[in-house]
Amino acid sequence: MKDNNTDYQNDNSCNNSNISLSMAVISVIATLLPIIIGLALWNKLPDELPVHWGIKGNVDRLATKAEGIFIMPCLCAIIQIGVLIKLYIDPRKEQIHHKPVLVSIWIVPLITILINVLIYIIALGGKVSMTMAVFFIIGVMFIGIGNYMPKLKQNYTIGIKVPWTLNSEENWNMTHRMAGKLYVVAGVISIIIALLNNVLSDEVTIIIFMVVFLVTGIGSVAYSFWLYKVKG
């Protein structure tokens, strides 16, 4: 007879293959992929590339072509290496469900590729709202994270890592169920902001964005602390 507990543990664990050297190297190379794309487009790209936008999508900072192509991917690659090291040295990495691990490994490369491709499209004259795109990407990302939050097991890398969650499995589980809901709501609101970006004023957009994401972050920690005080 098949052991259901064993199956559950295998399904919800992160073995070394999930953070293998080959996957780590591929993810870092993927983060640097925009450099290759930029070099391929070098002769077509203008001498200056847009690298920063205001709330309404107006370009408010330009960089040289070389800066625009190299700086962001290189910085993101450094961040990606830090993420990989943190995942690898986590003493509780065996407890992390493999899907959240994959999300953690690939979120930086995917965002880097998306943002840089959008920069190239805009630089080449494409009519794309970077603000709308960023809010939409953040929204999808938060909805994805929110769906995986309740499945996270205790670890030191992914999730709400405060003393109360790390010291109590019950606190961890309840906190991440609540955080999952908050993240999904925040993601939906971010997508709505993206769709209404041309309607909302700059001030309203900033206020809604800040309130939603502060409530998501602080609310998750506050709920964890409340559980600690109530349940010990």
Model feature map: region roles:
Residues M23-V28, G68-L75, V83, V101-L110, ...:
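Select subsegments of transmembrane alpha-helices in polytopic membrane proteins
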Residues S27-V28, R61-C76, V128-I145, V211-V212:
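Alpha-helical transmembrane segments
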Residues G38-F70, I158-N167:
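Active-site and channel-lining beta-strand-loop segments
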Residues I85-M132:
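Ordered, amphipathic secondary-structure segments that act as subunit-interaction surfaces
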Residues V25-L39, L75-I85, I113-N116, M141-I143, ...:
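Hydrophobic core of alpha-helical transmembrane segments in multi-pass integral membrane proteins
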Residues T31, Q154-K231:
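Terminal transmembrane helical module of multi-pass membrane proteins
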Residues A40-L45, A77-I89, G144-I160, Y223-V230:
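Membrane-water interface of transmembrane alpha-helices
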Residues M1-S17:
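Short, Lys/Arg-rich, polar N-terminal cytosolic tail immediately upstream
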